[in-house]
Structures are given as C-alpha cells and as structure tokens.
C-alpha cells in the first residue's frame, strides 16, 4: 500500500515569505461557499495538487501489509508520482458497495485495485476495533446556498465506504511514520489523544 502526500516543503522554504504567511494563517478556513487558503491557490490547486497525468513531487510511505493487517515492512522516501486518474468519493463508494459498475467499465484496472483497497480497509478497521478503537460516525451538515447567498437547504453529508477507506489508509501511514521515528529515537512531534476517562467510557456503554 502506498500513501503519497504532496511535498509542499519543496516549494515553501523555511523562513520564506510564503512560510511566514502560512505560519500567520495557521490553517485553511473552510466556509460554506468559499475557502480561505493557508497557501496561494497556485500552489494548493496547482503544482502541489496531485492532478492526474502530470508528475508531482511527493512524500511517500510504502507499506507491505499481510492478510491480518500487520505491517511486514515499510519505506519512507521522497518521490515523483504520476497519478492515473481523479476519482470522486461517490463513484468509488458506488463501486465498492456494488451499486454502480460504471467505474469498472471505464477503468477496469483501477477498479480492481480499488476492490483490493476496499478489502484491505475492512481488515484494518476490524483490527483497529479489536485494539479498542471507538468509531464516532457523526453526520456533518451540508449547507446549500441560493444565488443570493442565503441558506436554501441543509443536507446531511453521508460518510460512505470511500471516506472510511481513506481514513484507514491515512491512519496506517501516520502510525507507520510515528513508529519509524520512535524506534530511531529522534525528536519528533506526535499528535495523540489522551486515554479516555473510565467513567465517561461507562456512560457511553
């Protein structure tokens, strides 16, 4: 399994004007009808976007995973990737849920890979459950605006199998990188959750 993240640091050098502005902003802000980006759109939507059919600089984590979801071997490296297709969550979910085979007819090789990825995501999820992971399946509201910018409807965003697949693979990549640096005994920033309060766990149960 390969997880590839755009190598933004190649273009945004430490101490540069772009770096200072990004530090000042802290993060991108997602509003109802627009995004206030942390970085210029020419970067985030251009050379740092993993668009299909073009070479892009990336940071990659390749993981060899067995049938039980255990990582046998891994490699972390700088890479140049050439994406084959731009996929959308709805179409991938339809394929994996057996609702629509249009993606399979159009891109059979990609569809076969997605089926394997879906199987692996299921294995990883079940393994995570056995470790005591709690699944919070919150439905986020999707606010629809009319032409005048006023709220016309509120829909519930459905979290489907494609969303969960990405979550599992990103979790695995993050855990792999964290463990890699842990064993190297190098200074590293870890983003972790504190252990839950036992009384609160009992309330949830």
Predicted regions, residues:
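Conserved, carboxylate-rich catalytic/transport cores that coordinate ions
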Residues: 1-205
